[in-house]
Amino acid sequence: YKNDKIEDVSQVYNGSRVIEGTESKHIDLIYSSDGIKKNILPNLTDPLANENFIFRNDQKSVLATYDPFANKIIRVNKTEAYGISPRNAEQSFALQILLDQRIQLVSLSGKAGTGKTLLALASALQSRKSYKQIFLARPIVPLSNRDLGFLPGDIQSKLDPYMQPLYDNLSVIRHQLKANTKRIRQINEMLEQEKLNITPL
């Protein structure tokens, strides 16, 4: 994993495109319908499965995604998962895809602190009834056995500092749910029953 290098960052798929100059009637149609055929949009070329778009002009804009199952461009609604709401377009796109049960694997990339883990955890909790167990994992590749040996305490004590960001995300969700004791109780029960398992990779 240390040897691969990206030669041209602009060639990396970032999951979304901004489509400028979209006619207002098409933006209104995306807003008012349950999806439109991709060929209705003349300035849209070769959408990829689950690719996200910001269609806009000088007056208005709409967030949308290409649904390969319906073969349509559909509106991305601002939604929430376990008390967590998206704060920008990218988080709205991520949450929509994470909550879509038809999509088996979602890969999120971005800078530290952009909400990737938080959104993934909130979406998993929101969809908990669809799964027997949720694993929240963090790779400890930078820690060799030699590094671990120099750290004080047992194995759990050695790993705790590296796992803390995952617990921090869970704390954020709990804080958002402070008025909803039922959901907080559900989280505690999932942890006790190991239905929510926070573990190193």
Placement of each model-derived feature along the sequence:
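Pre-Walker A (Motif I) flank of P-loop NTPase domains
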Residues: 101-107
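Conserved RecA-like ASCE ATPase "motif II neighborhood" in helicase/translocase motors
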Residues: 190-201
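Structured core elements
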Residues: 107, 135-136, 197-198
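Conserved glycine(s) of the Walker
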Residues: 113-115
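Hydrophobic anchor at the beta1->P-loop junction of P-loop NTPases
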Residues: 108-110, 120
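Conserved P-loop
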Residues: 118-188
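Feature 3881 marks metal-assisted phosphotransfer/nuclease machinery
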Residues: 2-97, 101
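Active-site lining segments that contact anionic ligands and/or coordinate catalytic metals
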Residues: 103, 131, 193
